[in-house]
Amino acid sequence: MVENQKAMPQPEMRRIRRIHFVGIGGVGMCGIAEVLLNLGYEVSGSDLKASPVTERLESFGAQIFIGHRAENAAAADVLVVSSAVNTSNPEVATALERRIPVVPRAEMLAELMRYRHGIAVAGTHGKTTTTSLIASVFAAGGLDPTFVIGGRLNAAGTNAQLGTSRYLIAEADESDASFLHLQPLVAVVTNIDADHMATYDGDFNKLKKTFVEFLHNLPFYGLAVMCLDDPVVREILPLVKRPTVTYGFSEDADVRAINVRQQGMQTFFTVLRPDREPLDVSVNMPGNHNVLNSLATICIATDEGVSDEAIVQGLSGFQGVGRRFQVYGELPVDGGNVMLVDDYGHHPTEVAAVIKAVRGGWPERRLVMVYQPHRYSRTRDLYDDFVNVLADANVLLLMEVYPAGEEPIPGADSRKLCNSIRQRGQLDPIYIERGVDLAPLVKPLLRAGDILLCQGAGDIGGLAPKLLKSELFAGAVAASVEGKLK
């Protein structure tokens, strides 16, 4: 946590003194809560269970309640809620009854951004990594930004930090269309893909129009940074009536990458920018998708006057984000070791990008995947895409779908996914019942030199650390924060 530094003056929210977060342990909520704590507000919050996140906030002065009860919100001047919280929640019901304002998290983020130089990163994929890269490069350039990220920035040990400069860098969440609350000065659109379609009534055109509306929240002197490699971003570009800069591998992009070369975790490439000398950079993340994330960062850093030296330093020194191709360590097996990787990818596009990165960085190694689909609705809507991409693993174990509050949907489960993948004839997936200890199932499948990838947005996030500590893998070697083996 940043001590109570002198930051850009934050206009007082009139009578607001105590801010209560319903679901404060959520990744989108805790960061905003931490920044508000550092700004001097009283912060309280509730969640269903304690976690390292709630314990961290409590150590900084937040009052944490376990469980949702009406009295938790009694002293609040405003309630902050995520889209997962509805009016049946007793704290929300009490606030509404007492005429205490109830605002979505994005509206509170917009309030923080309103008086700062806001940089908002939107897109179906790559938001967290791109936001983190921008924060890293700005820090290397001495700009000390405030940031709110949807993942743990390894170098900072947190997903939010109050900086001393005018910059606020944050993710813009399209999943519930709440990014329309934001009014940044600079906005990034990394890509636009079919996800969270219930928010948009299943209408992809509505999703595209909402992204255009988000970009039109920019002032006339703002900047839209857009990935030209994404066909949908390219399609909406003529509709955006704001200054734009494009990036990608495409020859007609304003800022583009050439000479890409991957060596394990490191990716090297050359950046071409208008009226600039070519710039050779490297980033400690594999895959072309991370080259694109880096290009978005370079566009913004260049526009804000960050030196090339700081850009190179910020990218090369980037230590990654929690659960984004996070190397946990090495597991011992007969004849050698297996590299253990954890990743948050839960959309077929993200899964494909990670598999491609593994093939590019370690072409000689087998990929053993433990995958947990996230949400029955996503599994149903993108079923064929999941079948196609998961079939590219060498060995596949499929955990049952993580429901994320949804009821099961017939035909949208992991057992059926296994059958569909098996019918392709490429590999024979193994179905994993809910609650099964995976270590005894995984170990016999591993060979020396394999890469074991645990992937998904549900509780599979706890699998990699469990495997590292399992007695079946005694002698496992943990990686350092930046993913290097100790």
UniProtKB/Swiss-Prot annotation:
Transmembrane segments: none annotated. Belongs to the MurCDEF family. This is UDP-N-acetylmuramate--L-alanine ligase. It is found in: Cytoplasm. Gene3D superfamilies: Mur ligase, C-terminal domain, Mur-like, catalytic domain, NAD(P)-binding Rossmann-like Domain. Its EC number is 6.3.2.8. One of its GO terms (molecular function) is UDP-N-acetylmuramate-L-alanine ligase activity. One of its GO terms (cellular component) is cytoplasm. GO terms for biological process: cell division; cell wall organization; peptidoglycan biosynthetic process; regulation of cell shape. The gene is murC. Pathway: Cell wall biogenesis; peptidoglycan biosynthesis.
